[in-house]
Amino acid sequence: GSEMCIRDSDKSPGIISPDFEKMDLHLPKRAVFAFLGEKRIERFVLARGGEKAGTFVSLTKDFPLWMIKADKEELCILQAPAGASAAVLLLERLYAYGVEKVVALGCCGALEKLAENVFFVVRKALRDEGTSYHYLPPARFVILDESAADIVEGVLRENHVSCESCATWSTDGFFRETKEKVKARRAEGCRVVDMECAALAACAAYRGKVFAQILFTADTLHDLSHEQRAWGKESRDKALLMGVKAAERL
């Protein structure tokens, strides 16, 4: 029939399990899932005496699993690939090998004139991607874990980083963000747009895991890089550091 298959909701386990590779891998409880460049993550980890502890292999590239010593215990850092379905494939594997709590960290587009130098802690995400529907019944938004978001906001404030709560529009159609859609999404309360948040939050909810997401606008980063006093040149490193500090508290 003409009914969209995205509406078929089924809670039963998948035929392929996320630990299908049966790797001898025991990850720590906490992880930072970073939509940032590979070299940047590697530099950040090595500068803090961290090391590579394994690799998630995918058809097109390998994703190194980095470990760093945080205040209390070890913490894992993994690069996140762009796009909801690709990102969820890796989030699932993090959870399958022992991770319980994840802070995702990434760039977003601004749907309105936003204050400069602000980081956003996502409270809800509009499900305009396909992946979340494989994890949760159809709904317009997915609500993110409230206590996790509160903790993350607290950590950012403690570190004197301006932050605000937000709703994000998670879309698969990067090049299909039309004027009308932007207007409509803004009317629904979305201040920023990203590609993965709704799917990651849905996956976490289905698996019963803790998940939070920090977003920063490309323009924010551009502005931050000129804010020498507080931020220095490596604004993205600051974002990574905040992700680590937030994950430690979850």
Ranges and model annotations:
Residues 8-9, 188:
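Preference for short coil/turn "hinge" residues that link or interrupt alpha-helices
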Residues 56-250:
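Glycine-rich phosphate- or other oxyanion-binding loops that anchor nucleotides, phosphorylated ligands
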Residues 11-60, 69-71:
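N-terminal low-complexity or amphipathic/hydrophobic leaders
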Residues 1-6:
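Short, small-residue-biased leader/transition segments that mark boundaries at the very start
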